Amino acid sequence: MYYAVKKGHATGIFNNWPEAQAAISGYSGAEYKKFNTKEEAEAYLINRDLWVEKVAADNKDGYLVAFTDGSYDKELNRYSYGVAIILPDGTEQDICGYGSNKEYIDSDNIIGEIFGVINAVDWAISNGYEKIKIYHDYEGLSKWLTGEWNAKAKASQMFVSLYKTKFEDFVKAEFVKVPGHSNVIYNEKADRLAKSALMDRKKVTVQG
C-alpha cells in the first residue's frame, strides 16, 4: 500500500500509514490518498489519473467501457446495481436499479454485481456496440463465464445461462478486475449509483 501526500508537512510517497499520518497531522488543508500501486501514487502527485488515461485508451481502441458495482442491505432485504458507462466520444451514461427477488436475495451484493454487468452488456447491444470492456471488483463475474469457478448459486447460474444465450454471440466482452474502494473514480461512481438505487429506490438511465 502507498500513501501519497500532495500537501502536508512533508510531501511525497510513504510506504506506511504512520509516516503519512505524521506528514499530514495538524496540517490545514492536507491533501493525500491511498493507492495500491506506486505508479498510481506517483500519478496523483502530478495530477494525472491513470484510470482516466486507461479508459481513454480503451475508447480509442473502439471499446465501450463500463464500470459496474453492486450493493445490498439486509434490513431492507434489497439489492442494487450501478453502472458508469463511458462512450468512445467521452460522454457518460449512468445506469442504476434495485430489486428484491427472493430467488437471488441470499447472494447479498453479488446479485447486484451480476445485474450491473447484465445491464451494461444489454445497453451495449441495444445501442449497437460490438465491443465492451467491463471493469468490476468481484472476480467471480468473469470466472463463472470461463468455467474457472463453478456457478453453484441460483444467481450465478442465472447469470451464466443468460450471458451464454442472450449476449455472447452479439458482443465481445472483456472483463477486468479492479480493486474495490481504491480511488478509481469510475468505480466509485458506480458504487455511488448502486447505493443511491438501494436507499432511494432509484431505477434510472441518465446520460451525463
Please identify what each model-predicted range represents.
Residues 57-111, 123, 202:
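RNase H-like nuclease fold core
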Residues 70-77, 118-189, 193, 202:
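RNase H catalytic domain
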Residues 29-54:
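Short, mixed-charge low-complexity intrinsically disordered segments
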